[in-house]
């Protein structure tokens, strides 16, 4: 498929798990002789939650929780049918969200 590009976006809470998954995808794409751009680290989404510690009063006593979503972007340029087939067979961990655009 000349002139085409596959864009893969990965999201996870654990950055180590995310990097392992990105490495697997890049290795598979390179083994099928496709050009790979990435993994490109995208900005981390950081969400803070502020909660009262006590159920009734003591408004000054609060607890803060944080959620971080790490993201990576991988572009596969001029993929072959072999590449697409190999990408479909990859087993990725459960904590990694994969979004693919052609």
Curated annotation (Swiss-Prot):
The keyword Metal-binding is annotated on this UniProt entry: no
Keywords, ordered alphabetically: Ribonucleoprotein, Ribosomal protein
A Pfam family assignment: Ribosomal_S10
InterPro entries noted in UniProt: Ribosomal_uS10 (IPR001848), Ribosomal_uS10_CS (IPR018268), Ribosomal_uS10_dom (IPR027486), Ribosomal_uS10_dom_sf (IPR036838)
Molecular-function annotations in GO: structural constituent of ribosome; tRNA binding
GO biological process, any: translation
Highest taxon, organism lineage: Bacteria
GO cellular component terms attached to this protein's record: ribonucleoprotein complex; ribosome
PANTHER family: 30S RIBOSOMAL PROTEIN S10 FAMILY MEMBER
Subunit structure: Part of the 30S ribosomal subunit.
NCBIfam families: PRK00596.1, rpsJ_bact
Similarity comment text for this entry: Belongs to the universal ribosomal protein uS10 family.
Biological function: Involved in the binding of tRNA to the ribosomes.
Designated name of the protein: Small ribosomal subunit protein uS10
Organism, scientific name: Thermotoga sp. (strain RQ2)
Lineage: Bacteria, Thermotogati, Thermotogota, Thermotogae, Thermotogales
